[in-house]
Each structure stands twice: as structure tokens, then as C-alpha cells.
């Protein structure tokens, strides 16, 4: 039997920045859990619209955009 693992609460739609001075990004949905227990989350760069995968632990550490 396989266990169903629910993704953590994701702040979908929040605008955050990479560190204090980095570019802004919008948080998307959880994509998949990694072997170390972290989650990959879809993010979208505000200025360019480019999308990427980003670790949930980094999202939680990044500040909200100003």
C-alpha cells in the first residue's frame, strides 16, 4: 500500500523576493516532494513571467516583497 502525502500549506499567490534585494516572484502550486522531504513549488517571476521550480524551504525563508 502506498501512502498519500499531502503537500504543505503553500502561500499560493503571495509575492516574495529572493532575499532582501532580489527580484520578486509569485508563489504557485506544489509540484512534488523531494527525497529529503522538502517540496518543489512552481514560481513565476513578476517582471518577466518566466516560471521555475523552487524549494519550499527557500520560499519560507524569503521575505514578502515590498
Regions found by a protein language model. Give the residues of each.
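Mixed-charge, Lys/Arg-rich low-complexity intrinsically disordered regions
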Residues: 1-14
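A short beta-strand micro-motif
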Residues: 11-19, 43
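Short acidic/polar mixed-charge low-complexity motifs
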Residues: 21-24, 48-50
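Short beta-strand-centered aromatic/proline hotspots
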Residues: 23-32
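Residue-level recognition of conserved beta-strand positions in structured domain cores
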Residues: 29, 43-45
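A cross-taxa feature marking solvent-exposed loop/turn segments within ectodomains of secreted
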Residues: 34-36, 49
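Short aromatic-glycine-enriched beta-strand elements
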Residues: 37-42
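Intrinsically disordered, low-complexity, charged/polar segments
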Residues: 45-66
Amino acid at each position: 500500500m502506498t501512502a498519500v502525502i499531502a503537500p504543505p500549506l503553500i502561500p499560493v499567490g503571495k509575492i516574495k523576493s529572493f532575499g532582501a534585494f532580489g527580484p520578486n516572484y509569485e508563489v504557485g502550486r506544489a509540484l512534488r516532494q523531494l527525497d529529503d522531504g522538502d517540496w518543489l513549488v512552481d514560481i513565476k517571476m513578476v517582471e518577466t513571467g518566466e516560471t521555475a521550480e523552487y524549494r519550499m524551504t527557500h520560499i519560507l525563508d524569503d521575505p514578502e516583497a515590498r
